Amino acid sequence: LLDREGGKPLNRVDYANTFYRELDDAEKAIEILETMRTDFLQMESMVRVQGFNRKTMKKGKWARWEKTYPEIISSLVFIYRETNRLEDAEIILTGWVNRNPTDGNAKKILDEVRSGG
């Protein structure tokens, strides 16, 4: 299910969360989510440089990924905090806040993470 080319990115986030919650496999969940985060950033860079077309990225696919990106970040931060990987959570949150400087909730969580929680 994870390797299907046509699979929806939001479904993969759900699979990652299932690995964490139901199978108690934080490492697999993090691997899935970090791969997705990297894939998103690469696609974003490609779209900025090359735009949309059949060979690079279709608008519908990009819209699905854009919609899913906050869920990827949220899930990563949650799992990192739950597994006491606060430095990793801080890195992810710092990147998010830099991209979304008006997100007060993310800033609050970042402050909590920086203070050890």
Positions of the model-derived regions?
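Flexible helix-coil transition and linker loops at the boundaries of alpha-helical arrays
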Residues: 1-8, 37-67
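Structural signature of alpha-solenoid helical repeat junctions
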Residues: 7, 25-28, 61-71, 102-105, ...
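Residue at a conserved register position within TPR or TPR-like alpha-solenoid repeats
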Residues: 19-20, 80, 114
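TPR alpha-solenoid repeat register
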Residues: 11, 45-46, 72, 106
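Structural register within alpha-helical repeat arrays
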Residues: 15-19, 76, 110
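Structural motif corresponding to the intra-repeat A-B loop/turn of tetratricopeptide repeats
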Residues: 22-23, 83, 117
